[in-house]
Amino acid sequence: MSEMVDTTQTTTEKKLTQSDIRGVFLRSNLFQGSWNFERMQALGFCFSMVPAIRRLYPENNEARKQAIRRHLEFFNTQPFVAAPILGVTLALEEQRANGAEIDDGAINGIKVGLMGPLAGVGDPIFWGTVRPVFAALGAGIAMSGSLLGPLLFFILFNLVRLATRYYGVAYGYSKGIDIVKDMGGGFLQKLTEGASILGLFVMGALVNKWTHVNIPLVVSRITDQTGKEHVTTVQTILDQLMPGLVPLLLTFACMWLLRKKVNPLWIIVGFFVIGIAGYACGLLGL
């Protein structure tokens, strides 16, 4: 009598740990460290992926070499919002290491497909809204002579930056390929519009608070029965009509000049010249 013995080959599922994800997050802070004109952020992306590649692919294995080469392809996006792309790539690499039929083209296709739309969101949110608003808050405090101003800007901006990077990687990894659905349906456009509206609202309030323009040209002088003289200036009339009108017009003028591609340095110099000349001629006051 012969005895049949069934043998089954078991393989251990390869799984990224929280330590690996934290390692990717920490390395992503050096994302721009090796930026170059040929492949932009490719080296930074590959450097960030190293902890995951070490976990998923054995040392001195062809699969590890392919993974390294795979992430040296051209990549360029806003550096903070590269985090969810890193997270999605982690999920895809994990599935591939466990035998899923995911080729190089699929992984790079997801990266290329996400880096453009996310760059369109990251630039207006971080460079056009978050940084100017925090800088304005810090500058307002610094104008009073307090060191808290620049410290506040540094702390707030980096809190947002680090939170975006960490939770972006974690979110992208947890969602995997499904993140593409979340990016659809006009979500990115609504997010960008909302951030832009909030930024414009805050900057509008700051313009009225911190921009001071005085036009002391006298319109009339009236002496009352007690002999007290009442002077009406152009600035008095403007404040009665709409407080902060001149600073608002100056802001619109700056926006128009910037859209015409005028160098911001020349705009600043122009304001200096107008202010000095206007004060010398008596058109502007302190």
UniProtKB/Swiss-Prot annotation:
The chain crosses the membrane at residues 104-143, 148-176, 187-212, 245-258, 265-283. It is a multi-pass membrane protein. Residues 1-17, 56-62, 96-103, 177-186, 259-264 are cytoplasmic. Pfam families: EIID-AGA. One of its GO terms (biological process) is phosphoenolpyruvate-dependent sugar phosphotransferase system. The modification N-formylmethionine is found at residue 1. It comes from the Bacteria. It is found in: Cell inner membrane. The keyword Membrane applies. Residues 14-284 form the PTS EIID domain. Its main location: membrane. Residues 144-147, 213-244, 284-286 are periplasmic. The phosphoenolpyruvate-dependent sugar phosphotransferase system (sugar PTS), a major carbohydrate active transport system, catalyzes the phosphorylation of incoming sugar substrates concomitantly with their translocation across the cell membrane. The enzyme II ManXYZ PTS system is involved in mannose transport. The EIID domain, with its homologous EIIC domain, forms the PTS system translocation channel and contains part of its specific substrate-binding site. This is PTS system mannose-specific EIID component. It comes from Escherichia coli O6:H1 (strain CFT073 / ATCC 700928 / UPEC).
